[in-house]
């Protein structure tokens, strides 16, 4: 279309003298038209940009079919993996236009159902709906391939709806139900499962009564079997088996009181970091207390020894000084005529360092009588500072005599 416009513009171009305006104009228009048409052509391709374009709003569904007079079916959404339902118009099956009705793959699928889309073989055989669908499919084989395919799809949908009631848990096969995990029996340890939050979360042991219906050509036998199995849902479970019921408010980490089949009581799991004896801070506290008590006892004994030794030293020194004083007093007050005085002098009575290395030889001391002492003019001094004897027992010694005696003793 735009090429015709360009051709018309080129034919209608007016050639002015010196200015070919028509040629320039149609070149510019052609470039503009190409720039507009190229993105539209790219959007129609199967590239990744096609999915980013906004989709047109869907048309509202028809509420009434004008041909058959029956209410029209609501079309399936675009994102649904299930194929749209086939409408029956005037007793004939009408397939979608985009789908071929006579494919060799579809004909093979009509004769042999696909494995894995339905339930396990035991469940497929036991379902009454499958029996009806198989009978209808056998009648539809003679009718035609489109009707066979529609009936097979309908039978598969019935199987998906009746999956829970016809599931055989003894085979421990996984189910196709969302948020539902069925486990087979694993042993006697199922009742001792660890539960962090008792009564709210965690798997528990559940027994489900399942009814399995088996359809035979002549007779129909219904058997009810109780199969213990473990059911995990989103978080809220319930125990139905009275033998393995766990109370909701009691933690499962406690030791189980019910013995197992062997008669042995199963021990609960030990928590990591839990010690069987005292804690670390208790051991440290006891050790420090013992050390302090022992140190106090040692200090008391040392102080007692020191006090006893110092008391003995003081007592011994005082006794020695007393003995020295008594001895010096005795030496000064007792002057026999034929005896030489001892090594301790009057001036060394209270000094232990001044001792004579040998006995001093004294010359003959004149004998003084009481008259001579009283008649001698001078001062008299007592040399004893302790407990004085009576005046009759004391002997007064003149100072001149003491000084003379000091010079006469060679020490």
From Swiss-Prot:
Describe what happens upon changing residue 396 to A: Predominantly localized to the apical membrane
An annotated GO BP: negative regulation of wound healing
Q: Which residues lie on this side of the membrane: Extracellular?
A: 44-282
Output the PTM entry.
Thr-237 and Ser-239 may be phosphorylated; however as this position is probably extracellular, the in vivo relevance is not proven.
Where would one find the signal peptide in this protein?
1-43
Q: What is the effect of changing residue 303 to A?
A: Predominantly localized to the apical membrane
Location of the protein in the cell:
Basolateral cell membrane; Apical cell membrane; Cell junction, Adherens junction
Biased composition range(s): Polar residues: 166-178
Ranges of the Cytoplasmic topological domain: 304-411
Gene Ontology MF term list: beta-catenin binding; protein domain specific binding; protein-containing complex binding
Q: How does it sit in the membrane?
A: Single-pass type I membrane protein
Low complexity compositional bias: what residue ranges? 115-146, 247-263
Renumbered to this chain, region (Targeting signals) spans: 303-411
Note the Pfam families from the entry: AJAP1_PANP_C
Query: Which Gene Ontology cellular-component terms appear in the entry?
Result: adherens junction; apical plasma membrane; basolateral plasma membrane; cell surface; cell-cell contact zone; cytoplasmic side of plasma membrane; plasma membrane
Consequence recorded when altering residue 380 to A: Predominantly localized to the apical membrane
Q: Which UniProt keywords apply?
A: Cell adhesion, Cell junction, Cell membrane, Membrane, Phosphoprotein, Signal, Transmembrane, Transmembrane helix
The residues that cross the membrane are 283-303
Q: The organism sits in which domain of life?
A: Eukaryota
According to the record's subunit comment, the protein's assembly and interactions are: Forms a complex with CDH1 and CTNNB1; interacts directly with CTNNB1. Interacts with AP1M2. Interacts with isoform 2 of BSG/CD147.
- Purpose of the protein: Plays a role in cell adhesion and cell migration.
Q: What is this protein called?
A: Adherens junction-associated protein 1
User: Can you name the source organism?
Assistant: Homo sapiens (Human)
């Amino acid at each position: 279309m735009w090429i015709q416009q360009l051709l018309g513009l080129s034919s209608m171009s007016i050639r002015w003298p010196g200015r070919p305006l028509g040629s320039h104009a149609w070149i510019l228009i052609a470039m503009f038209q190409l720039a507009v048409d190229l993105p539209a052509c790219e959007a129609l391709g199967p590239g990744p940009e096609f999915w980013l374009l906004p989709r047109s709003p869907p048309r509202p569904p028809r509420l009434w079919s004008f041909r058959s007079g029956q209410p029209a079916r609501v079309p399936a959404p675009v994102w649904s993996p299930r194929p749209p339902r086939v409408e029956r118009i005037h007793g004939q099956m009408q397939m979608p236009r985009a789908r071929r009705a006579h494919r060799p793959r579809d004909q093979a699928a009509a004769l042999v159902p696909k494995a894995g889309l339905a339930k396990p073989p035991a469940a497929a055989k036991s379902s009454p709906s499958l029996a009806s669908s198989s009978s209808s499919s056998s009648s539809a084989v003679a009718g035609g391939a489109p009707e066979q395919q529609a009936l097979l799809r309908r039978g598969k949908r019935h199987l998906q709806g009746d999956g829970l009631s016809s599931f055989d848990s003894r085979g421990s096969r996984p189910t196709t139900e969302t948020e539902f995990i069925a486990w087979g029996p694993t042993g006697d340890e199922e009742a001792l499962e660890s539960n962090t939050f008792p009564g709210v979360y965690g798997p528990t042991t559940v027994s489900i009564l399942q009814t399995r219906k088996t359809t035979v050509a002549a007779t129909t036998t219904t058997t009810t079997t109780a199969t213990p199995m473990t059911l995990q849902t989103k978080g809220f479970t319930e125990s139905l088996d009275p033998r393995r019921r766990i109370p909701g408010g009691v933690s499962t980490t406690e030791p189980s009181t019910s013995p197992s089949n062997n008669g042995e009581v199963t021990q609960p799991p030990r928590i990591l970091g839990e010690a069987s004896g005292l804690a670390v801070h208790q051991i440290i506290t006891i050790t420090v207390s013992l050390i302090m008590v022992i140190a106090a006892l040692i200090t008391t004994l040392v102080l007692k020894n020191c006090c006893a030794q110092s008391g003995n030293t003081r007592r011994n020194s005082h006794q020695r000084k007393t003995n020295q004083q008594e001895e010096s007093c005795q030496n000064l007050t007792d002057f026999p005529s034929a005896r030489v005085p001892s090594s301790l002098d009057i001036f060394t009575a209270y000094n232990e360092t001044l001792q004579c290395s040998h006995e001093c030889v004294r010359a003959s001391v004149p004998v003084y009588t009481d008259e001579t002492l009283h008649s001698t003019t001078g001062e008299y001094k007592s040399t004893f500072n302790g407990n004085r004897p009576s005046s009759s027992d004391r002997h007064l010694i003149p100072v001149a005599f003491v000084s003379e005696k000091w010079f006469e003793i060679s020490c």
